[in-house]
């Protein structure tokens, strides 16, 4: 049980996909302008990464490995993720049309989010079992969501701040992301895993 908790904390804080591995930067910068949009994107990404990790592990273990077609891994995983994203898109459209409108093009683009595909490929490369893959996917998604929500809250504050003209927009956003990355480096010694 401790091993799973350490894995979760490790991927959530110490090895965060956005701030340490630099995966998922497109939605991180694009969707994080409003807090409610970032929360919605975080929830959708959490669902996709967790369920995608589970199904990708199952596809790998019960289809790709037995049939010795490992060269189709990336294509198979993208297909699995596309199905999960399509399901989540239909769900969000039905449950919250306003959130669906706010997320816009970023919801279908979860399929090509490198953090989503990255967690699936890392699960296979690290030889995680089913439970570890699920925890790794959920922890990675929780870390992605945490960073995205924190960044959106900071950007909302920056939008009403008096920032010098050369630093407005993307400049201050990148500086803020860099400072957040430095702050997360403080967690480096937290978990030795």
UniProtKB/Swiss-Prot annotation:
Transmembrane segments: 5-25, 39-59, 62-82, 102-122, 134-154, 171-191
Pfam families: Rnf-Nqr
Keyword Flavoprotein part of the UniProt annotation: no
Cellular component terms per the entry's GO annotation: plasma membrane
Function: Part of a membrane-bound complex that couples electron transfer with translocation of ions across the membrane.
Subunit composition and interactions: The complex is composed of six subunits: RnfA, RnfB, RnfC, RnfD, RnfE and RnfG.
Protein's recorded name: Ion-translocating oxidoreductase complex subunit A
Originating species: Pectobacterium carotovorum subsp. carotovorum (strain PC1)
């Amino acid at each position: 049980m401790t091993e799973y908790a350490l894995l979760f904390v490790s991927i959530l804080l110490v090895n965060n996909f956005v701030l340490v591995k630099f995966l998922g930067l497109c939605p991180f910068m694009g969707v994080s302008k409003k807090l409610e949009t970032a929360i919605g994107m975080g929830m959708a990404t959490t669902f996709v990464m967790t369920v995608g990790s589970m199904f990708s592990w199952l596809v790998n273990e019960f289809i790709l490995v037995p049939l010795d077609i490992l060269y189709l891994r990336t294509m198979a995983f993208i297909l699995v993720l596309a199905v999960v994203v399509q399901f989540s898109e239909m769900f969000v459209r039905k449950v919250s049309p306003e959130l669906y409108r706010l997320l816009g093009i970023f919801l279908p683009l979860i399929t090509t989010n490198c953090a989503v595909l990255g967690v699936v490929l890392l699960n296979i490369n690290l030889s995680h079992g089913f439970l570890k893959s699920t925890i790794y996917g959920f922890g990675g998604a929780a870390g992605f969501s945490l960073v995205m929500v924190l960044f959106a809250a900071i950007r909302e504050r920056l939008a009403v701040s008096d920032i010098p003209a050369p630093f407005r927009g993307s400049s201050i956003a990148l500086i803020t992301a860099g400072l957040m990355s430095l702050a997360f480096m403080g967690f480096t010694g937290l978990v030795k895993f």
